[in-house]
Amino acid sequence: SSIEQIDSKFIQRLFNYFGNIELAFNADLNELKNIEGLSVKKAENFLKYRDKVDIDRTYTNVETRGVNFLTLEDENYPKMLKNIENPPAVLYYKGKLFECNLEKTLAVVGSRKASTYARDNLKKIISGLGNTDICVVSGLASGIDTVAHTAAIENNLQTIGVIASGFDYIYPTSNKTLYQNIENGYGAVVS
């Protein structure tokens, strides 16, 4: 996933063909040409950028920052996510992902400018689930996402915050304490 020009659909094709990330990563052009639906240009781009990736340095960087990861071949990769059409090849996370019941989740999606009505009703719904093993899953933007995670924590629920920005910076910065609370015992932040 360190090669920006390569998307998860490409990685999924490699994984499906080779059955192993390491074999896929070390493939040559002739092997890549055998993969149905994979253009020669995409294969050549992969080889060009692959040779610039320092796997050991990337791994050390992830590890020293306290970030964990799962790949598609990991038995702990969430089953529901693995079964979507184009699952992420790698999930990076901080926190206690496996304390969350990934079989019982409540997904919350809503506006960054949520109305008072939406905020209040979401709090009521989540408080009704308090002290159960349901895990709340939402983005970590402002608005309804923040309400969902805050309500989950207030009601002793595990929660998973999904971010698109990676772990280099927190967005919005007003959610810094929320990120830390999730990572430090109330679930996980996933990128």
Language-model features, listed with the residues they occupy:
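Glycine-biased, small-residue-rich flexible motifs in mid-sequence functional cores and linkers
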Residues: T71-S191
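Short, positively charged patches
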Residues: S1-G128
